Amino acid sequence: MSKNLKKYWKSEIELTNSDQVEALRHNEFVDKLPIDSILEDKKSLQDSSTNRRDFLKYLGFSTSAAVLASCEGPVNKSVPYVIQPERIRPGIANYYATSMFDGYDCANILVKTREGRPIKIENNKLANYHGSANARVHASILSMYDSARIQGPISNGKDISWDDFDLEIIQKLDALRFNNKPVVLLTNTIVSPTTSKIISSFTDKYENITHVEYDSISESSVLDAHEIMYGRRAIPYYDFSSAKYILSIGADFLGDWLGSNYDGEYAKGRIPVKSKDSKAYMSKHVQIESNMSVTGANADIRIPMKIALQKLFLAHLYKKVASLDISLPGLDSVHKLKLEEIYNELISFGKSALLVCGIDDVHAQILTNSINDLILSEAKSSTKISLIRKGDSKKVNEILNKIKNSEISGIIMCGVNPVYTLPNSNMFLDSLSKLELSLNISMKMDETTSSCKYVAAASHYLESWGDFQFVNGEYSICQPTIKTLFDTRQFDECLLKWSGNNTPLYDVLKDNWNSNILESNFSWNKAIHDGVYSVKDNFKPKLVNIDFSDSIKKLIDYKVEGFELCLYSKIGMGDGQQANNPWLQEFPDPISRVSWDNYLTISKKDAESIGLKNYNESNGALNSNYAIVSLGDSQLKLPVLIQPGQTNGTVGISFGYGRSLGVKAEMMTGSNAFMLYKNFSKVQDVKIKPHHEIHEFACVQLHNTLMGRGDVVRETTLEVFNTKNKNHWNPIPVVSKNHIETAVNKKEVNIWEEFDRSIGHHFNLSIDLNACTGCGACVIACHAENNVPVVGKREVRKSRDMHWLRIDRYYSSDVSFSEDKENKENINGLSDSLSVFNEMEDPNENPQVVFQPVMCQHCNQAPCETVCPVAATSHGRQGQNHMAYNRCVGTRYCANNCPYKVRRFNWFLYNNNDEFDFNMNDDLGKMVL
């Protein structure tokens, strides 16, 4: 039998402070029971005439009364249809194909509606590209049912009608055009062919208007590099399913890199598939990065490295691939060996290899493109390009300077929030008030909208018509799934109206598709039904001769004096557009397992040198010191999270938090990292000093500890998988039979009667841990499907989170190097041995990571069923574990007896409860239930 020598641990504290964690494991209740207050009046208790028999009688009656009362069903009053719509059958869901793009996230999706209400997002399997929804796309449905939405047009702080609003705006625009005063139309990236035509018509009428696209988190380095090398400003498209060797240098492609939707393609290559030689093959993934990312957590080999060293490493790699005879600063012996190994693998895999790079530097992107071209990588598409990022930071800076110098007289904005996302937002805010026209087309009264003279209430994408082209040749349609909830209007409709075009947007959209997109054999109705449509539109690059030696010189000319700050976006919060979404606020980060916060990630070594600590008060209550991060005149105070795998000398902060307007008070969490986003660069040279305050995190990484589990995760290498019998890496469970450990089948040891499985269906759900990347989309989907309540940060700290599905994240390291003879024998040279021994000495430096989704297993003989005193939980004939809520009296015996620790209890009534002011306490928010 194979013995797994790895040690699995959930946090740095669990690894280093076993006594504290052991005490927390046995602490069933976070709050102590108020025994002292119960026994406070001892005299009255002593003088009581109630005897033991009477006490038990009262107790028995109260328990019986509770059980009887619990059997009363709730009464819900409903209002029926006056006239039943023909196509709507009560209880039967309808699905509509549509698409979503908010300037940051995009997806081709299906929307589940019930009685005319959109209630859930699903993937559109007909889509060739971007056919899956991430956590934020799943949660976006709740953003429609947000009572904080603007409900009509506003002029100078007063509600007015659309007719009066249009009249005022047209008069302003005509006056500015007549006087030839410049106006800026500032939007997020536009990927809609129809919207692009409408904007073109609008700027043709008003020639003084300049359209500028602005991405809150810029990808200009990638776009500029592609334009320099291939003649078009776009993002390369990567097919991870066809890559057998993936080298990523700083690219979190399973996170938010380039608006990524690569999870599905990546997962296809990670599932071992047998070939003709009967061996299974899967892609090999090497990740070089500074922050511990979701992509790094999924890599076969992860190499922590500072950005400055990443640039030098990339330059050396290009030198070897291109066979250049140039002089470069040297690498240390460890990284020299890594370089040689990676180079040899890259060349041996050749066209099956792929290099992706997340370094925010145009020269790094140029070298990356060139390496892929030199190895003839087939995973980097030669015909497809991604169009979901177009923002040009140079043009945005030019506009900002013109606004500052009073060279701009008006601004119209849509899909952007520069007062929040610009590092120099105070300057922009001061200039905004001086403009003759300041207009924002927005759904929320956010930081920018609240400072504008005119506000056009925008519709949600689920209330809108539109189209998108995320990838060249791949079109998708956005159609409304519900009538507008408020007196709102789309951006396109506003521009049509102000251009003097009264044609309905639907007709403009349909005419554009019939004239310019659809072929004669494909109908408009079919396109709406499918939601997607493909045409042959291959990208033809225009190759340009480039002096790559100049890029190498500029790339390596980079030095950092203090800490290297790496700004990034979380899978949950993104760029902060959905900060008022409670599902996303309570969503635990896949790596840190922290919800309701952002923080400064730092390595254990650096934290100790500065004097920063983390410590647990309970299984959900992680406390930490604050730190002051300084960059020039800007300072940001954040709590510190000691992150295993963080590169020494680097720190990380996520965007998307620190919102101050347009969100409920409960959602005003974290700090605004955009303050440190100088020159639209994700890497900054910062100074850090400790602060005396203590911060309280809601961190679920020690929740639901599985007791008595040795090998928490069954895993092995591909080589062992191919060469050994499955019982070697997945041993058969044994029991003691006649004092001998014997492998027996289930029937021999089962103490319960078997269920009859010969009738009806028997449901089963399997999760392929090779394919799971830990992205958490399923967690939000489960929230939506099962109406799971949001409990808030305070309750999460008490281990009272209500997620029915959780994704456990385990770090792993070897327990004892002396026991691992095979590893010792495979050591190659002094450098390798030092590296291996260092890993054994401090697993925190670079642990391996594994994700494990856990939900109700619907056990055949479920332990929760046998201990319930009132039979509230029972077993169905189709194998499911059933729950009768109105029978439950809350003993929580089932939670105590669940080996997977997936039982959830509502400690309060969250519906219509002002203490939990989230979507269930909101008349509009409850529409998603």
Give the predicted meaning of each segment.
Residues 210-229, 290-294, 376-405:
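Short connector loops at secondary-structure junctions
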Residues 184-186, 246-250, 354-356, 409-415, ...:
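Structural motif
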Residues 301-403, 516:
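Active-site phosphate/pyrophosphate-binding segments
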Residues 484-540, 794:
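N-terminal leader/propeptide and maturation segments of large enzyme subunits in energy/redox metabolism
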Residues 2-334, 339-340, 594-598, 605-609, ...:
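N-terminal export/assembly segments and adjacent metallocofactor-ligating motifs
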